[in-house]
């Protein structure tokens, strides 16, 4: 037991001066691991870095929800890609269709891919796609009914939308 304590003490004395370099190496390794993970993700999902615009625009071609793509690929199924174009002339998009027609998937795809781009992640869409950077991304997910405040699902969504509209650019 004394020998173990002596060995560990000697080891600690030897390593202690190297702690800053070890921590720096650890941070560098974490950064390399992150870059490698992004590259692997890009390969798995055929993701690219789209052309970034200095204006608020979405001009997406064959955009695909990456998590859905990976999930369906396990069953040899493919995701239906979507094209979206929003710009200063065409600022509103109405999405309609039957139940299970892809409306929610479309909205989730837009939100996720926009967020991914703004985090510096590659996204699965055609290389000729263009994407603007937005100062805010707002999301209203789920049912936020409040019995105490007497808010229905619909009025809760309206309250959230009001806050978003006041804060958006």
Regions from the language model: what does each represent?
Residues 133-169:
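Switch/coupling sub-region of P-loop NTPases
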Residues 1-100, 105-109, 114-136, 159-160:
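Alpha-helical coupling/stalk and coiled-coil linker elements that connect catalytic or binding modules
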């Amino acid at each position: 037991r004394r020998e173990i304590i002596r060995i560990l003490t000697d080891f600690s004395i030897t390593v202690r001066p190297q702690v800053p370099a070890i921590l720096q190496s650890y941070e560098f390794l974490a950064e390399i691991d992150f870059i490698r993970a992004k590259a692997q993700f890009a390969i798995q999902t055929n993701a690219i870095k789209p052309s970034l615009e200095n204006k608020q625009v979405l001009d997406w071609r064959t955009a695909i929800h990456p998590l859905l793509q990976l999930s369906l690929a396990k069953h040899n199924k493919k995701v239906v890609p979507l094209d979206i174009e929003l710009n200063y002339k065409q600022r509103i998009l109405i999405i309609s269709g039957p139940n299970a027609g892809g409306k929610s998937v479309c909205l989730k795809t837009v939100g996720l891919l926009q967020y991914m781009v703004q985090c510096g992640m590659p996204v699965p869409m055609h290389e000729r796609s263009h994407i603007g950077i937005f100062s805010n991304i707002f999301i209203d997910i789920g049912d936020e009914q409040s019995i105490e405040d007497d808010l229905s699902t619909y009025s809760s969504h309206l309250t959230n939308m009001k806050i978003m509209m006041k804060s958006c650019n």
